[in-house]
From Swiss-Prot:
Main function: Acts as a coactivator during transcriptional activation of nuclear genes related to mitochondrial biogenesis and cell growth. Involved in the transcription coactivation of CREB and NRF1 target genes.
Compartments reported by the entry: Nucleus
Chain positions covered by the region annotation Necessary for interaction with CREB1 and NRF1: 1379-1450
Natural source organism: Homo sapiens
Start-end of Gly residues biased regions: 23-32
Compositionally skewed regions (Basic and acidic residues) per UniProt: 1096-1113
Subunit field text: Interacts with CREB1 and NRF1.
Region (Necessary for interaction with CREB1 and NRF1 and for transcriptional coactivation): 433-467
Regions of compositional bias (Low complexity) in chain numbering: 201-224, 522-531, 862-873, 1365-1383, 1427-1459, 1468-1500
Name of the protein: Peroxisome proliferator-activated receptor gamma coactivator-related protein 1
């Protein structure tokens, strides 16, 4: 009423929304509660189209917007619009004043309100007055809303989701007096309220009237509502709802921005999806201008409206004043809403109930005539920035995209308020922007949807006016948004911007004063107009400054945001309106320019109005990208991660359409650029989940860049952005409206929706399908990260180029999304240098940079909907951690080699940014880590967060743990790193991260020779990258394998080390490996070569060649175990797993030096705990240690050699599976176990030992054998060197091979080996032991040539390893020949026989007889070493003896029988410390083996291992049982002591209903009770015992305990316990009860383990 009075007095209501004539018009002076919020203004006060928001108590979500469209309503002073109608009051009063149909409508509305709308009696009266006025004014020209509504419809019960529709505009102002009624003394807001007919937005869905956009636009007098017209209610059959001209009713709904009744009704079916808030008057203006630029005049609009009403809701029809009339109004009432000639103002009424959930806002925007761009509402409008929703011509659109907002410029103040409303209603959860053409984000901001919806309604009114013509031409854009405080970014942004602009503009505020309370749609439009007018940031800032004052309720937050934005000189965000205006690529410009970012990326906007505002601001920023991308305020910056997006919004933006908004990625994110006649600006399916403010914010930020662009388009000025598309939108709205506003999300109303979906599907196909729909914080990206590792690279790679192309093609938009994430700048021509470098981008847009990661994530979504769009954006949006979520994809870092290709693949959405960032792949974070060392791996994820694109890299941390090893390798391959991003679809994130982690690329540089090729391979040769990918996938499981497989990461390290030893050859080979799967093998070989040095190098060459062929096939397999082995063997003597381990030590130290150590650390990270535990616990563990170290070496090699070694090793394990290798592995397993079993245990051990690759048993097995082989080879070399050969040569010495291997490293690189093993494997203890012996042994066997030769044989052990000149021949025969064992024993013969020794190992496994002498020699040698090497030495000794043993099976069995006992005993004795136990078991093993054949010893070891384990387990159990018995005994003693101390009180005659706790509670009054028990007996009294801490308390209980009984209870029988309690346990009741409550001490479990005991116990239980 205050607003009414203010209007009458010509006083603008206070912007504060106070009860006085403030924007809220007193109707809702203080809050959203019963009165329309001040920010919305007294809806009635809004000129053009006032919206009375019947705001639910809930707030934004529910409110009825009475849109007073025509000046007539304004003139009639429809103050009731500003009033909030209470359901009950409204119904009662209405019933008294209205006919049944009207009452029914109201009732429906009330039902919608669900008593959430608390309407004051005043409001009721106002509403009645407005209705009366409408009815009175009804004439042939101005149909009564009710006239156009069939009685049946009027009587129809409210439908769900049609509350906005039910909020029917009671009257429609004449077109000339439509939304824009300069007459309004208070300004557009007040004037429009007065001038416009009452616009009743009834949330009740049953109101079939489409939102009275006509109300907004048309005067209430218009007889738009014709009862005769039976138009299917939106809710019922949106598709059938068409105007007589055939246009879909949806169009009308869009025109009736408020869609009060109509939209509410539509909401039932289509409106629900098509929330009242058409959201963008500007859009309407655009579409209307373009489509309906020619629309005849108000007359046509009226007729069109009638038709529309027929198709849509009658109430809508009046609102749909023809654009011409609307334009007339604009001219006549510039203050009210100065829309460009082609502009349609959408007034959207947030429907409290419907809007809360999902509202689609059909926005019909006429494209502004190119010429009339300044057709801003008026000079007065211009005066009022908000009013001046300039409908920029195409030419000026670029300059002032905001002008489109003119639609909303109905009221500047209102514009803000309206915008808010729109934000609440219109932007309420726009699930999808059905409008392919309309890139209006208004739908996005759900928080502000209600205010935005009002404004949209107003826009729609005008739109409705021009709708007749424009409807068909333009698409009605439906934005589904939840009206409960969730606004799409676009709308919210608009409202925010509007508020910012408008608030600074007092005149605008005056105009929108009443509306600002609740009917902010017009204020929003006005704000847009003002923003357009003040295209410069200062206007925006000023607006922001004033915005906060103007917006009180929900808008308050926006003002704050706006203020912050405004505070920040960067109008970019703020520029959503202003900057958009100022920026060459404003929404209008977008519309005008096909390049304009059609897709509104404001995807899920935070429910939080503030967030929404931020998002909106960000969107705005995006659109006005030319303005400073600098985020206006941190919050804005966050939500404005969009800022980067802003950049892409440049004219080049057109392609950006596809870019989905961060969270928006849900679905609408990538609405195709609508190829509508206007700009291809596609309506982004702004399917935002405002419910999650954080998500919304994130999506704002996340979508910041791209979403921002879109959001700016959409949120900036949904109409503005949409305006170009308005035509399409209108059409779409009609069609969609017909289809179903409710199902708007489900049904692609406009092409843009279809396109969007199509694109989304494509993106999903390209990248893992990440439903954008769950943008809220899911970590789909995380889940996808694991799956995407291998898959994404391939999938992404092909799509990436295409997407990239598309993104590049429209870098503006993609960058908008991608820009931030991937490097908006690179991807987008839209100049945002910062984008080009994520870091730079973040500097440019400090907050945006932060947001950028978020956006970056959305960008990946853009790349591939599945990868990041849905989840990543949401994650991104949800939290900076999204980077973590994306981080998962960063896990991909392992496949850095592929990143080059991956960047492409990764960049389905981000390809461009990614490509730009390719150097800065998401891996950069990992590279960053890599430089530090594998241990740093986890940091990279953090680093990315730190980096300019923290959000993007929040995810990498996610995977960082699993991928820690890979990341290190990745560092060398900076560009390759993109692979991970690609696979993960966090590419954008990665890219930013890379920018942050350019240093990692340096490592690649150091490894330059290997790295470049790996990159090439990853990019050019999918096979190679696939290898990487597979290893990467496995990488988390096996760091070694990963490094090996992920040559990129591991390889670089290796290469670095490698160059020193065998740099030339390894380089060449590494290159080859990089180029092809061989690369990995080569890398490994080269690393090995380095380790072996010259001999190794020579062998490496042939081996590499062999390995390549083999490895290549295996690589594709992800890890052909045999091939890896072969590869490994060439690199290292791939004789036995143990040998390999040894070799690992040597080569690893040599080859990888620090790199290897780093790799070891990585492995350590993943494997340390498990490996140690498994190895330590079992003798196998010690063997596992050998194996693990080999894998570690393998990893090291992989790292040093470009990951080739690891992969080969991993594959080699298959070869190693051969008896010899298995024998080596046997160290882990008891000698008795078959080679396969050995292998399996090895795998298990490896799994335990290294978390890296063992995840896959096969991988583990292969890796482990690989490692074992390497270790063994080194061990063999050492043995040969030290003449320990015999003991070491035999395969059976697999257990001890690790010792031998240790030896070899000392010779080559003992120090490195030790650190590597220790750091890398958490086998530190093992390795320490091994290393020590190795060091001592190393000197013993110093001859490097010997090592080389030995290595060859060892490698030969895997037949391919024999690639070495001599080894090849020997391999087959020697494997089978038993002579190898002696050779092994003898250092001289060792080299040639070594292969035979390996073979012999195989035989040993086969249990083939072997010469005893070699065995004994080996055993002796090993034994000596064992004493030196302790556990590792002994293990190797036993291994050697077993391998060299040629004794018969009988001796074997004998040794088995002897050895296992010793071993077991030793083991059990040493069980306390894994190392000691290992040593002792090894020693015992070796001693027993020495006494018996090595073969028997080997088998013995196998059998021994398990049995000691069993023993130790048994011992543990015994000890545990003993401890349990001890505990029980202690309890008994304690009880006895308590009894003796008289602290136990016996309580007899306990009632049966009493519980122990109750008893304890009763008697606790006497003191602290230590124990309380109750014993129930079938016969006799129940009794219990209470043990007090002190005897005095027990005495007190006995003396006074009887007083505790209740009246209905018998007195307790109290005495000191012990008398009966501890009588002989002959009392069965006592006994059983005691066991029940107090289990008797259990005898040692062993006693109960034997059958007799168990049987007795069972029988005893049965007897009980």
């Amino acid at each position: 009423m205050a607003a009414r009075r203010g209007r009458r007095d010509g006083v603008a209501p206070p912007p504060s929304g106070g009860p006085g004539p403030d924007p809220g018009g007193g109707a809702r002076g203080s809050g959203w509660g019963s009165r329309s919020q001040a920010p919305y203004g007294t809806l009635g006060a809004v000129s053009g189209g006032e919206q009375v928001l019947l705001h639910e108590e809930a707030g934004d979500s529910g409110f009825v917007s009475l849109s007073r469209l025509g000046p007539s309503l304004r003139d009639k002073d429809l103050e009731m619009e500003e009033l909030m109608l209470q359901d009950e009051t409204l119904l009662g009063t209405m019933q008294s004043y209205m006919d049944a149909s009207l009452i029914s409508l109201i009732e429906d509305f009330g039902s919608l309100g669900e008593s959430r709308l608390s309407l004051e009696d005043q409001n009721e009266v106002s509403l009645l007055t407005a209705l009366t006025e409408i009815l009175d004014n009804a004439d042939s020209e101005n149909l009564s809303p009710f006239d156009s509504i069939p009685d049946s419809e009027l009587l129809v019960s409210p439908r769900e989701g049609s509350s906005l529709h039910k909020l029917l505009t009671l009257s429609r102002t004449p077109p000339e007096r439509d939304l824009i009624t300069p007459v309004d003394p208070l300004g557009p807001s007040t004037g429009s309220s007065r001038g416009s007919g009452v616009e009743m937005s009834l949330p009740d869905p049953s109101w079939d009237f489409s939102p009275p956009s006509f109300l907004e636009t048309s005067s209430p007098k218009l007889p738009s509502w014709r009862p005769p017209r039976s138009r299917p209610r939106w809710g019922q059959s949106p598709p059938p709802q068409q105007r007589s001209d055939g246009e879909e009713e949806e169009e009308v709904a869009s025109f009736s921005g408020q869609i009060l009744a109509g939209e509410l009704d539509n909401c039932v079916s289509s409106i629900p999806d098509f929330p009242m808030h058409l959201a963008c008057p500007e859009e309407e203006d655009k579409a209307t201008a373009a489509e309906m630029a020619v629309p005849a005049a108000g007359d046509e609009s009226i007729s069109s409206l009638s038709e529309l009403v027929r198709a849509m809701h009658p109430y809508c029809l009046p609102n749909l004043t023809h654009l011409a009339s609307l334009e007339d109004e604009l001219q006549e009432q510039p203050d009210d809403l100065t829309l460009p000639e082609g502009c349609v103002v959408l007034e959207i009424v947030g429907q409290a109930a419907t809007a809360g959930d999902d509202l689609e806002i059909p926005v019909v925007v006429r494209q502004v005539s190119p010429g009339p761009r300044p057709v801003l509402l008026d000079d007065s409008l211009e005066t009022s920035s908000a009013l001046q929703l300039l409908m920029p011509t195409l030419e000026s659109e670029t300059e002032a995209a905001v002008p489109k907002v003119t639609l909303c410029s109905e009221k500047e103040g209102l514009s803000l308020n309206s915008e808010e409303k729109l934000d609440s209603a219109c932007l309420l959860k726009p699930r999808e922007v059905v409008e392919p053409v309309v890139p209006k984000e208004p739908q996005n901001p759900p928080a502000n949807a209600a205010p935005g919806s009002q404004r949209a309604r107003k826009g729609r009114k005008k739109k409705s006016k021009e709708q007749p013509a424009a409807c068909v031409e333009g698409y009605a854009r439906r934005l589904r948004s939840s009206s409960r405080g969730q606004s799409t970014v676009g709308t919210e942004v608009t409202s925010q911007v509007d508020n910012l602009q408008k608030q600074p503009q007092e005149e605008l505020q005056k105009e929108s004063g009443p509306l600002q309370g609740k009917g902010k749609p017009r204020a929003w439009a006005r704000a847009w107009a003002a923003a357009l007018e003040n295209s410069s940031p200062k206007n925006l800032e000023r607006s922001a400054g004033q915005s906060s004052p103007a917006k009180e309720g929900p808008l308050d937050l926006y003002p704050k945001l706006a203020d912050t934005i405004q505070t920040n000189p960067i109008p970019t965000h703020l520029s959503l309106v202003d900057s958009a205006q100022a920026s060459p690529m404003p929404v209008d410009s977008v519309e005008a320019d096909p390049t304009a970012v059609g897709p509104v990326l404001a995807g899920p906007v935070p429910v939080d109005p503030g967030l929404v505002d931020l998002a909106s601001t960000s969107s705005e920023l995006v659109e006005p990208l030319p303005a400073e991308p600098v985020l206006i305020n941190p919050v804005l910056a966050d939500s404005a991660a969009v800022d980067p997006a802003v950049v892409p919004i440049s004219d080049n933006l057109p392609p950006v359409d596809a870019v989905p908004s961060g969270p928006a990625p849900v679905d609408l994110a990538l609405v195709d650029p609508v190829p509508n006649d206007l700009t291809p600006v596609d309506p982004v399916l702004v399917k935002s989940r405002p419910t999650d403010p954080r998500r919304g914010a994130v999506s704002s930020a996340l979508g910041g860049s791209a979403p921002q662009l879109l959001v700016e388009s959409e949120s900036l000025d949904p109409p503005k952005t949409i305006i170009p598309e308005v035509k399409e939108v209108v059409d779409s709205l009609k069609i969609e409206s017909g289809t179903s506003a409710t199902t708007h999300e489900a049904r692609p109303r406009p092409l843009s929706l279809s396109e969007y979906r199509r694109r989304r599907q494509q993106r999903q196909a390209e990248t893992e399908e990440r439903s954008p729909q769950p943008p809220t914080g899911k970590w789909p990206s995380l889940p996808e990260t694991p799956t995407g590792l291998a898959d994404i690279p391939c999938l992404v790679i092909p799509p990436a180029p295409a997407k990239k192309t598309a993104l590049q093609r429209s870098p503006e938009t993609p960058l908008e999304i991608c820009l931030v994430p991937v490097g908006p700048s690179p991807a987008s021509p839209s100049p945002e240098p910062p984008v080009s470098k994520p870091v730079a981008s973040s500097p440019t847009e400090q907050v945006p940079s932060q947001e950028m990661p978020l956006l970056a994530r959305p960008s990946p979504p853009v790349q591939s909907v599945s990868p990041a769009v849905p989840t990543p954006p949401s994650m991104s949006a949800a939290l900076p951690f999204p980077a973590g979520g994306l981080g998962m994809p960063p896990s991909l870092p392992p496949p850095p080699l592929q990143p080059p290709s991956l960047p492409l693949s990764m960049g389905p959405v981000l390809p461009d940014p990614f490509t730009h960032y390719a150097p800065l792949p998401s891996w950069p974070c990992y590279p960053h880590v890599s430089p530090s060392g594998y241990p740093c791996l986890p940091p990279p994820p953090t680093v990315p967060l730190v980096s300019g694109t923290p959000g993007a890299y929040a995810v990498p941390p996610t995977c960082s743990v699993p991928w820690a090893p890979p990341p290190a390798p990745v560092s060398p391959y900076s560009s390759t790193c993109t692979y991970g991003p690609l696979g993960w679809g966090p590419g954008p994130q990665h890219a930013p991260f890379w920018s942050t982690v350019p240093p990692p690329p340096l490592p690649p540089a150091s490894i330059g020779r290997a790295v470049p090729q790996p990159k090439m391979e990853s990019r050019g040769t999918p096979a190679g990258p696939p290898e990487n990918v597979l290893p990467l996938s496995m990488a988390p499981p096996l760091s070694l394998g990963l490094p090996g497989h992920g040559a990129p990461q591991t390889e670089p390290t290796k290469v670095e080390v490698k160059p020193v030893p065998a740099s030339p050859h390894p380089k060449h080979k590494v290159s080859a490996l990089v180029q092809s799967p061989q690369m990995k093998a080569l890398a490994c070989v080269s690393a090995e070569g380095v380790t072996v040095e010259e001999p190794a190098s020579e062998r490496l060459k042939p081996e590499t060649q062999e390995t390549r062929p083999r490895e290549k096939p295996p690589l594709p397999a992800t890890k052909a175990v045999p091939t890896p082995r072969q590869s490994t063997v060439p690199k290292l003597p791939a004789v036995h797993p143990a040998r390999l381990r040894k070799l690992s030590f040597l080569p690893t130290p040599r080859t990888q030096g620090s790199e290897d150590v780093v790799q070891a650390f990585i492995s350590e990270i993943g494997i340390e705990a498990s490996d140690l535990s498994s190895l330590l616990e079992q003798f196998e563990k010690s063997e596992a240690k050998k194996e693990c170290p080999p894998p570690a070496p393998a990893d090291s090699l992989a790292v040093g050699n470009s990951g080739g070694v690891d992969i080969p090793q991993e594959k080699r394990p298959l070869d190693r599976l051969q008896a010899p290798e298995l024998a080596n592995v046997a160290g882990l397993t008891p000698p008795a176990t078959p080679p396969h079993q050995l292998w399996k245990p090895l795998a298990a051990v490896s799994l335990l030992a290294k978390a890296k690759s063992p995840k896959s048993t096969a991988q583990e097995g292969t890796l482990k054998p690989e490692g074992v082989t390497e270790a063994k080879h080194p061990a063999a070399v050492r043995l040969q060197e030290g003449v320990h050969g015999p003991s070491r040569v035999h395969v059976g010495s697999g257990d001890h091979d690790y010792c031998v291997r240790s030896r070899t490293p000392p010779k080559k690189m003992p120090a490195l080996v030790i650190p590597e093993v220790g750091s890398r494997w958490n086998v530190k203890r093992h390795q320490d032991i091994t290393i020590k012996p190795v060091l001592s042994l190393g000197p013993a066997a110093p001859p490097p040539p010997c090592i080389a030769a030995s290595r060859e044989p060892l490698d030969h052990r895997t037949s391919s390893e024999q690639a070495d000149p001599s080894a090849p021949c020997l391999a087959p025969s020697s494997l089978l020949s038993p002579e190898a064992s002696p050779c092994r024993n003898d250092m001289n013969t060792r080299t040639p026989p070594e292969p035979s020794a390996k073979q012999r190992s195989m035989r040993c496994y086969r249990k083939a007889c072997r010469s005893a002498s070699p065995s004994s020699q080996g055993w002796q040698g090993r034994r000596g070493r064992n004493s030196r090497s302790v556990s590792s030495g002994s293990n190797r000794t036993s291994e050697a003896s077993s391998s060299s043993s040629s004794s018969s099976s009988s001796s074997r069995s004998r040794s088995r029988s002897l050895s296992p006992p010793h071993k077991r005993w030793r083991r059990s004795s040493c069980s306390s410390s894994g190392r000691s136990r290992r040593c002792s078991s090894s020693s015992s093993s070796s001693s027993s083996s020495s006494s018996s054949s090595s073969s028997s010893s080997s088998s013995r070891s196998r059998s021994r291992s398990p049995s000691p384990r069993r023993r130790s387990d048994r011992r543990r159990r015994y000890s545990s049982y003993r401890s349990h018995d001890h505990y029980q005994r202690q309890r008994v003693l304690q009880k006895e002591r308590a009894i003796e101390e008289r602290r136990v009180v016996f309580i007899g005659k306990i009632p049966g209903r009493m519980t122990r706790s109750e008893l304890k509670q009763r008697f606790s009054v006497f003191g602290e009770i230590e124990e309380c028990t109750i014993h129930f007996r079938v016969q006799g009294d129940n009794y219990g015992f209470v043990t007090y801490r002190y005897a005095e308390e027990a005495f007190a209980a006995i003396e006074s305990g009887h007083k505790l009984r209740q009246a209905d209870e018998q007195p307790f029988d109290l005495c000191f316990g012990g008398r009966r309690q501890f009588c002989k346990r002959s009392y069965s009741d006592l006994d059983s009860n005691r066991e029940d409550f107090d289990p008797a001490p259990v005898k040692s479990k062993f006693d109960s383990l034997d059958f007799d005991t168990l049987l007795k116990q069972a029988q005893k239980n049965l007897r009980r």
